[in-house]
Amino acid sequence: MEGPSNPGENLGIISVNPNTCESIELTNQILAKTYTTSWTDMEVYARGNGRICTAYPDVDHPLQDVRGNVSSILERGERSGGFETHPPRDPVTPRERHGNIQTRGAVIAPTPFHVVAAIPQQTRKRRWDILDGMVRRTVSQSTVDPKTVVMCVYRREEEETYDVLDEEEQDDDLLGIPNPTPRRLRISQAGPQQNSWVDTRGRRAYGSQEEQDERTSTDQVSIFSHDETRELSSPLECPIVGCTASFVGPRRWEKAKSHIYGVHSLEEVREIPRGELICKGIVRCETCATLLPTSDRAKQAHRDDCRPYLPRKENIRRKRAAEREATEASAQQGIALRLERQGPYITPRDIEEPTNTTTESWWREKVATKRYLHRKEWPQWLDICRTVLLGYSASSQGERHQRQVMLLDLVRNHLHTRTARREQQQQRGKDNQEEEDRQKKEEKSLRNAWKPCASSVRQGGQPSSSQPKRLNRWSTAPKWLKQSGNCTRRRISMIFPGPPVEQPGVVSVDAEEVAKTIARRLTRGAAPGLDGWTRELLYPLTLDPALKMEIAAVVKDIINADVSMEVGRRLQATSLTVLRKPNGKYRPIGAESVWAKLASHIAISRVMKTAEKKFSGIQFGVGGHIEEAIAKIRKDFATKGSLAMLDGRNAYNAISRRAILEAVYGDSTWSPLWRLVSLLLGTTGEVGFYENGKLCHTWESTRGVRQGMVLGPLLFSIGTLATLRRLQQTFPEAQFTAYLDDVTVAAPPEELKNVCAATAEAMEALGIVNNADKTEVLELTGDTGFGTAVKRVREFLERTWPDPMSEEIREGVEKKAMETDRLFKAIVELPLYNRTRWRILAMSAMPRITFLLRNHDMQHTHRVASWFDERTTQVMEHILGQPMTERARNIAALPVSMGGCGIRRMAQVAEYAHQCAGEKGLQQRKTEEADQRQQDDLYATLGGADRQVFTANTAAGAGRPLTDAQVRLDDATFGVYLRERYCRVLPEGVKCLCGEDASNHHIHTGTKVHNKPRQMRHDIINSVFANGLRLCGFQCATEPRLNEVSKRRPDILIAGLDTYAVTDITVTYPGRVTVGNTAQGQRSVAAADPMKAALVAFQEKERKYSYWAIQNGLAFAPFVMLTNGAIFGKSRDWLRRVLRGQDHRLTVTTAFDGITADVVAAVLRGNVHVYSAAQARGETLR
């Protein structure tokens, strides 16, 4: 061990030169002999360009003399020597303004729980090397926020020159003081005494004597530089949980990869938490689960290898899409891609930072936005969403958190209404002015912060009498350092339990599952949350394959609570809507974000099968088993003799949230819900009441689950399940049946009072108070014990259950069914399109009566079903404008796929609906059997062209006007379409202009029709078809010549980027072909071919133009349609191929659906012209 040669000018350096494999032992005695210290004053000054900064050393430890070359450390926000120090205005400048002080490094805290080191580059000014674990990156000084710097390391610069050192050596020789070698030229005493030509970093220069002697060792003292320091060969541990393998050596990363992919499975690699991988300097590709270092070069190399093989056209299409994306609204994406990588993710519950939600714009006002978009607006909406979503799954955790915030702001920024846009611009100007004022105030405070500090130092550390108020204001800590111990959010969140320490694996999400959930599970037309997203705005994104994958990644992060603190608060916050109940009271409804709804649906699907087993026999509210609950209650009532129906007052909002969280976290069955429940209910949520878009009042949600929350019914059932099971064990003679918050207790009459009292007490322990006004007691015989004597405990409404065979049940069922009459009157009286009336009748009126039929005996529902069928027939006749025949009503009762209209006869359903209650799928099977018998009976009564038309109505696409909202029809067109399905459009006895009977077959096949209406229909279809292709970027020419002498002309010639096609459009009547088809000799529709007429027309056109198309290199297929709107299968396939070959803004599915919907509507409008031309003059179709 060697100490400094001059203790008076201690350099603070101890050099240790052990032999190979020799241990090093340092004791106080050894250090005392080699190293000496000296005491200095309590203050150390670092002056620079008129600024004064003071650092106070710890009084318990001596400080080295600063006259030599030592480092000075300044910390922010810490008290030293009894007074709080303040940093300079810009603590991260590469060089201080004073010439003899240099900044050597800094410690930066981007978040309260994560720090990084910053080292200035020596060669490039205003550039810093950020060291974040094993990751190193270079950033500009402007990207470093001075407020995040917690400590700066300074070093005094050596100003001595060689001439000055020579003079100092002569002076020292005269005084007899040994002169040490200058630091930059000093080498070990073991080396030669002459100049060895060693540079400042200890490297031998060219031409030195030691250049060729590799055995000569020097113990040089070089300046520390992270660039020249090699990484330590620390062992690399296997990231798989439970594996203890570790690897050392220069190729330890290759060994670790071989071990992981050779020993562990792919599922284990996917389950590794992302934060744990980042701590080890590793990232995972979410596509193929490959592990690779956290370097941009490694990521880029892997992206090229991970991409699947794509054909040339697909590569061209993607390249153009990328170029278009780069030129349209890519500024936000560029900012997101330059975000700094953050540390391991910490759940929002663990972060203690003060939040003031009332100052955030997304909470202060509720912007009026569009809830749905027209299909023509989808391409622009997809382009906007691509700027945020594309690349989300390949981004780091910090980028994902930033993109999540941008995603929640998309609707508010791009789809707000005109009035909301104007108000938002005005508010934005006010916010910008407030922000500028705040920044100016902070800059002024920082600029003057050092003046009182320096003044107090000159006066011996005591502030002057004129400064106390200013010091009190300046001595406060920065905002980000303030602790939130007295914050309401922190105090309340502490009472909520957290999930278990050992979390389950990451919940995986499939893109196809997400698309199906959006299309089928999310409620149509539901009110949006504060972010403005709705199901209708989310659905177009599922039609793009790339965006569908990114949506799945977003949902996966939400389910696993991998979101930022701001996103967590925004998913918790709700807008309160108050609805009035029939009894005059109010029900609060909280509109949840559609992203939280989507994640909740996916999470529920992971536990639904287990939940049905958990709730079996006692809780029927999860899964919609209302019929089973009713059947059980009736059985228990007949067995026990009495029952009580209990209802909790505001049960959803009153139940203890702590009880819910303890029940969820206490059972590993619900582990897929842990992270999501902790995100949505683990802390207090903000509830706001808005009036005209302005926030009027706020509450903090600390109890229960919000009504309108997708997870609400499941969490409420979990919270009450243990109490119900415990009551069942305590009272074995009673039976408990719960449907969410409605609890029914069946017990012997003498025990019912005690059981109900115990049930009410147990529910009150959970926070649910029994509502006496809604409580009913039913009995067959005996006294239940409820009366005025127990009014002090709880009041019950007592009545006697009537005889099951009495007329009171039938009257009650009829009274309930008569409430549907208001819907029938609204359908007839409101100014609606006929197509809208039909949809309301089919989708809203029918399910209302089905519930009564399933839960009551046929003798009580037969009269109700007959009345419902009569009112339904009256509404259909009003829509058609003419009376309906018995055959037409039978056709309308069939499903749309079987050639009908989906308006079933409820009298027929009532015969077996009640018998099927409690048996899954039984009613559906019986209904299908009844429909098949009715279809076969109708098919047997029809003949000739009518049978062909009835068969063609079962073809795919023939019922699209009844089910697809894209096919927009006026009242006259929709009326003709419905009457054609009933086999006759014009009334009986109406003659054509030619004198023949005006049947459907004659109108479509007659040759003596004036004004050529069928040709007009053909021209309309050609125009609509060509316009649809032009919207997709094609160039279309109508009726090109085959050659100079031929009169044959196909309808449309299509030219695209790599597509050249031609087609001829044909509309044919199904009843035209009556020989050699299924109309002869077939006894059922199932054996018939609904597209026989279309097949014949397709073959004729193919023989006519296919040879010419092959000669000219054109993709040809006839586009054949039936008069009911059905399109031939080969024609549909040809159109998809054409659309797939062109690079356009619409997806293939969107373009195909839009073109075919417009063409179907054009065909049906053309049918109106055909029937109008055949009618007598002066008469028009309704």
From Swiss-Prot:
CDD domains: RT_nLTR_like
Top-rank EC class of the record's enzyme: transferase
UniProt region (Disordered), positions on chain: 77-97, 163-220, 317-339, 418-478
Biased composition (Polar residues): 456-475
Compositionally skewed regions (Acidic residues) per UniProt: 163-174
Pfam families: RVT_1
Protein name listed in UniProt: Retrotransposable element SLACS 132 kDa protein
Keywords for the protein's UniProt record, in alphabetical order: Nucleotidyltransferase, RNA-directed DNA polymerase, Transferase, Transposable element
Compositionally biased tracts (Basic and acidic residues): 420-446
Key word Transmembrane present: no
Reaction catalysed by this enzyme: DNA(n) + a 2'-deoxyribonucleoside 5'-triphosphate = DNA(n+1) + diphosphate
